[in-house]
Each structure stands twice: as structure tokens, then as C-alpha cells.
Amino acid sequence: MLSHLRPALVSMGLFTVLLGLAYPLAVTGVAQAAFPNQANGSLIRDADGKVVGSALIGQVFAKPEYFHGRPSAAGAGYDASASSGSNMGPLNETLIARLKTDAAALRAENPGVAIPADAVTTSGSGLDPDISPANARFQAPRVAGARGVPEKDVTALIDAQVQQPLLGFIGQPRVNVLALNRALDARYPPLASQKDG
């Protein structure tokens, strides 16, 4: 009987070591050597080396002097542990009510301007760090007014932050909200009254 079990036990032990230990360590080693930033979460640090966020996960910016990301379906404030879409269909009453509320708030902010779709819709993961260039330009008047700078300067900053589709055709042009807000702070620091509030 043991002679029948031996090949299975040896195979299980071999593949456990090979696929459960050797392969993950090899992949981790290659990733750390070839792509250390990406392997560690694409973290963004400030001048003091403090982590301020990730280029891959959105975060909440609620103040008027900052660009706001897409709404998040991943819990309160881009909670990565709750990552997922809302799974609400287009006729779901809760979704319709949220869209109407968000659209009304955005219309009050920019009356008479068409609202970009990604300003009111969540992404599939609920953690999207990017917005469309149209969404960023939609927010430019509010940000410029709150910062006390010309809108054309804010729009030029947006244009400089636009990332083109991968290989020219995969995806859509996009703007990383954290990178844009950091560039905004570097170029036009918040007014003294805004720093603490």
C-alpha cells in the first residue's frame, strides 16, 4: 500500500516546495530587481521621504483647492479592503439617487457645463486613481478660484499631467489625481488660510 502512496506523497512534497516556495521567491526576486517601485506598490513620497499615497490607488481629496477623484464604491474613502464595483444595475434606485445627488452638487459648482461621466460614476474596482482630462478641466474653475490663480494656468498644468493610452491605443487618456494635486501644490501652494483647513 505504501508503494502506491509514495509517488503521490513525493509529488505533493516536491510541488509544494517548488510552487509554494521556490516559484514565489523567484518571481518576487525578479520583480524586486527589475521593477522595484511597482513591486512595492508604486508608492509616492514627499520631499522628506514620507509616503503620501500610491499611483495605483485613489484617495479622497475633499477641499475645493484640490482636484477630486472619481466616486468610490469601495467603502468610505477608497478602502482597498472593500475593493469592488457596486454591482448596481442602471435601474437600481440607490444608484440613480446617488447619481442625481452627485450631479446636482456638480451642477451647482459649474452651472451650464456638461458633467463628464467619470465625475459621477465609479470604476470597476472602486479604487481608480485616475480621472479623464475632461473631468480635470471641468474642475479647473473651482481649483483656480480656490487657489487664486488664473484658470488657464491650471488648465496648462492639467495638460502637462495627461497620460496617453498605453502603446497609443490601450485605454483612454487619463490624469492621475494624486500626481496632479502634488504638481498643483508644487506650482501653486495653497493659501495660508487653506493649509490647516
Curated annotation (Swiss-Prot):
GO molecular function: ATP binding; P-type potassium transmembrane transporter activity
Membrane topology of the entry: Single-pass membrane protein
Any single Gene Ontology cellular-component annotation: plasma membrane
Ranges that cross the membrane: 7-27
Annotated organism of origin: Caulobacter vibrioides (strain NA1000 / CB15N) (Caulobacter crescentus)
Family named by the database record: Belongs to the KdpC family.
InterPro entries from the UniProt entry: KdpC (IPR003820)
A Pfam family matched in the record: KdpC
Compartments, record wording: Cell inner membrane
Taxonomic superkingdom: Bacteria
Name of the protein this chain belongs to: Potassium-transporting ATPase KdpC subunit
Subunit structure: The system is composed of three essential subunits: KdpA, KdpB and KdpC.
Role of this protein: Part of the high-affinity ATP-driven potassium transport (or Kdp) system, which catalyzes the hydrolysis of ATP coupled with the electrogenic transport of potassium into the cytoplasm. This subunit acts as a catalytic chaperone that increases the ATP-binding affinity of the ATP-hydrolyzing subunit KdpB by the formation of a transient KdpB/KdpC/ATP ternary complex.
Keywords: ATP-binding, Cell inner membrane, Cell membrane, Ion transport, Membrane, Nucleotide-binding, Potassium, Potassium transport, Transmembrane, Transmembrane helix, Transport
